[in-house]
Amino acid sequence: MSVIKMTDLDLAGKRVLIREDLNVPVKDGKVTSDARIRASLPTIEHAMKAGAKVMLMSHLGRPEEGVFSEEDSLKPVAEHLSGLLGKEVRLVRDYLDGVDVADGEVVLLENVRFNKGEKKNEEGLSRKYAALCDVYVMDAFGTAHRAQASTHGAGQYAPVACAGPLLAAELEALGKALDNPKRPLVAIVGGSKVSTKLTVLESLSKVVDQLIVGGGIANTFIAAQGHPVGKSLYEADLVDEAKRLMAAAKAKGGDIPVPTDVVTGKEFSESTPASTKRVSEVAADDMIFDVGPDTAASYADMLRKAGTIVWNGPVGVFEFDQFAAGTKALGEAIADSDGFSIAGGGDTLAAIDKYGLASRISYISTGGGAFLEFLEGKKLPAVAMLEERAKG
C-alpha cells in the first residue's frame, strides 16, 4: 500500500498536526498505563527535532460530544508527556481558530471529542482541523478503522496528509503477515463468541494453513464435532457455521484443529478446582475453561514450526492460574518460534504482559478493533484516505 511517510518529509518550520492514540487509563488525575503514550514518542520526537511546530490531537474516554468535562480532559496526558519528553507540553483548550506554536515546541490539543461533529466526520470541523497545519500526520492505528474528523476528514483537507512511523510500522507488519506470508501461516483466534469473530474466522480460514481456535469459540467447534460441552459457553446456533468453516478449510488444504483434551471446572471462579479430561468425557455440569496439555503440546508444535503467526485472543481463562497453562504454552511457543509473529487485541496483550513475552514477539499491534478489521480483510478508512492523498 502506498502512502506518504512523515519520515520522508521536510518538516522544518512547518505546522505539523499529529493524530495520535493517547486514549490511556487515568485515575485520580494521573495516567495509570502509558504504553500508548510511549509508543507515540518516536513520532513526536522526530517532528520536534526536525524543527516543526508540533500539535498533537487525540480522544480520551467517551465524553458527551461537544461538552467539556474535567474527567475526560487530556490534562493528565499533557503532564505525563511533559515528563517523558523532558520539556513542557502545553494543553490548548480553544484551538479551532488557530494555535501559536514555536518551532520545536510541542502542544497537545484538548480532547477531540469535545468538538461537535468529531464522530460524524463533519466537513466543517474537518476543514478547521486541516487549516491548523501544513502537514497532517495520521499515527493512530487504533482508531484507523473509524472515519472521524480527526482521523479521516482532517487528512482529506490538509495541504499534505501522511502516515506517522507508528502507523507505517503497523501497516508494514500486518502486510508482512497477511499479504505475502512465509508459510506455514498459523493464526490463533480466541475469544468468547464465534458471532463476534465470525468474519475474522471466515477471512483467515481462506489464507492460513492452520487456524487455532480458543476460548468460548473453541467450544462451538467442539460441539460441531459432536462432543459434549456441558454447561460451557458456546453458541448452538453457530454449530453449522463451525462445521462449514472446518470443511471449507479442509477443502483448500488447511485445517481448523479442534482440542482433543480440555481443562474443566464446575463454576467460573478463581477457586474452582480444575480437572483435565478427554474432550469426549466432558460431563453435563462441566464448563470448559482451557485446552488440555496434549492439545497445548500439539498446537505449540505447530507454532514452533510456523513461518508466520497471527495471534488474536487467549485460548483459556488465563486470568485464573488453574486455567492458564494453555495460553502460557502457546505464548511461549510463539516467542520461541523463528517465524514472524504479530499479536493484537487487549486480552492478548494482557497475556503477553503476564508471561513477559513482549521482547520475543516480532510485532505487537496497538489496535484492538482496527487490528481485527484488518484481519477481516476490510479497508481501514484512514488508510484508504492516506492512499488516496498519496496519489495526489
Swiss-Prot record:
GO terms for cellular component: cytosol. Disulfide bonds: none annotated. Its main location: cytoplasm. It comes from the Bacteria. It is found in: Cytoplasm. Pathway: Carbohydrate degradation; glycolysis; pyruvate from D-glyceraldehyde 3-phosphate: step 2/5. Substrate binds at D21, L22, N23, R36, H59, L60, G61, R62, R113, R146. Keywords: ATP-binding, Cytoplasm, Glycolysis, Kinase, Nucleotide-binding, Transferase. It catalyses: (2R)-3-phosphoglycerate + ATP = (2R)-3-phospho-glyceroyl phosphate + ADP. This is Phosphoglycerate kinase. The lineage of its organism: Bacteria, Pseudomonadati, Pseudomonadota, Gammaproteobacteria, Chromatiales. The gene is pgk.
